[in-house]
From Swiss-Prot:
Signal peptide annotation: none
Record EC number: 2.7.7.6
Domain of life from the UniProt record: Bacteria
Description of its domains: The N-terminal domain is essential for RNAP assembly and basal transcription, whereas the C-terminal domain is involved in interaction with transcriptional regulators and with upstream promoter elements.
UniProt GO cellular component terms: cytoplasm; DNA-directed RNA polymerase complex
Organism: Psychrobacter sp. (strain PRwf-1)
Region (Alpha C-terminal domain (alpha-CTD)): 247-335
Positions of region (Alpha N-terminal domain (alpha-NTD)): 1-233
Designated name of the protein: DNA-directed RNA polymerase subunit alpha
Record's catalysed reaction(s): RNA(n) + a ribonucleoside 5'-triphosphate = RNA(n+1) + diphosphate
Subunit note: Homodimer. The RNAP catalytic core consists of 2 alpha, 1 beta, 1 beta' and 1 omega subunit. When a sigma factor is associated with the core the holoenzyme is formed, which can initiate transcription.
Length: 335
């Protein structure tokens, strides 16, 4: 397979091997050398930190003032109960915040299925054990669930007056629906090329999103973030404004103003030399080739030019000037 040096090989095969509803292995190939790690690292970071999800950020437990309290009839410490609440896998539809309640009497095991849910909220792991109640145990609590991204420590969360109330226990929140991501890059071969990459991504979700959808969302986020570079337009530097070059006014005067002899003046006009600027650009050799113009006339011309600080065989930039009309030149022919 021969490619132009400027062309890049693009992946033409993607395989999603679903181990179960929450685990999958995604294989992408072939990739140019180095792109396996480039894409793998970027997708891994996005999967772990940028996908939206729901998590419990606050709990109010009846009879509990702080997380170091104990609740009569509950076998676990309050800290253990809060830790178990972090394992809830919650999906919310068309809502960013919701309050859930749990009211259960012992004896028995407390699971996520005991939480009362509104119609637009689901818990995908209802079998999750939250705690155990004894014969006289009674657990009544209210949970605050919000949508977010990544990991949010409780101590960095902005609080208002209500959330600072005694008895409102704050939890660190892990919003990401992806719990584990690992990738590896293997060698791949296409025809005679053996320097290619094969990217393998293994991921596990909490069940609120299937692995294939998680990969799709991560790739979409990456595409949206870098698409701005595709349309990046280089800002063209403004062209420098050229200052109008000033021409010595003497050069714009007609050769008649040199007050040469009639013979010399007529010889110059015969060669279409009408302005002093035309004259100073001629060399002695060129002028001596002019019919009827001898060395005496040449000496006269050189002396007159010297009296004005000029000489023959000068090099003038941008001559004739743009504002010197062609009509002006020909107007002297009739003189």
């Amino acid at each position: 397979m021969m490619l132009n040096a400027t062309e890049f090989l693009t992946p033409n095969a993607i395989n999603v091997d679903a181990v179960d509803e929450t685990n999958a292995k995604v294989t992408l190939e072939p990739l140019e050398r180095g792109f396996g790690h480039t894409l793998g690292n970027a997708l891994r970071r996005i999967l772990l930190s940028s996908l939206p999800g729901a998590a419990v950020i606050e709990a109010e437990i009846e009879g509990v003032d702080h997380e170091y309290s104990t609740l009569e009839g509950l076998q676990e410490d309050v800290l253990d109960l809060l830790l178990n609440l972090k394992g809830l896998a919650i999906t919310m539809h068309d809502q960013n915040e919701v309050f859930l309640t749990l009211d259960k009497k012992g004896p028995g095991i407390i699971t996520a299925a005991d939480i009362e849910l509104p119609h637009n909220v689901d818990i995908v792991n209802p079998e999750l054990v939250l705690g155990t109640l004894g014969d006289r145990g009674h657990l009544k609590m209210r949970l605050r669930v919000v949508m977010g991204r990544g990991y949010e420590p409780a101590n960095l969360r902005r609080e208002d007056g209500d959330t600072k109330a005694i008895g409102r226990l704050k939890l660190d929140a892990s919003f990401s629906p992806v719990s584990r991501v690992a990738y590896q890059v293997e060698n791949a071969r296409v025809e005679q090329r053996t320097d290619l990459d094969r990217l393998i991504i293994e991921l596990e979700t909490n069940g609120t999103i299937d692995p294939e959808e998680a990969i799709r969302k991560a790739a979409t986020i990456l595409q949206q973030q870098i698409s701005i570079f595709v349309d990046l337009e280089a800002e063209e530097a403004p062209e420098p404004v050229k200052e109008k070059e000033e021409v010595d006014p003497v050069l714009l005067r007609p050769v008649d103003d040199l007050e040469l002899t009639v013979r010399s003046a007529n010889c110059l006009k015969a060669e279409n030399i009408y302005y002093i600027g035309d004259l100073v650009q001629r060399s002695e050799t060129e002028l001596l080739k002019t019919p009827n113009l001898g060395k005496k006339s040449l000496t006269e011309i050189k002396d007159v030019l010297a009296s004005k600080g000029l000489e023959l065989d000068m090099r003038l930039e941008n001559w004739p000037p743009a504002d010197l009309r062609v009509d002006d030149r020909f107007s002297y022919r009739s003189r």
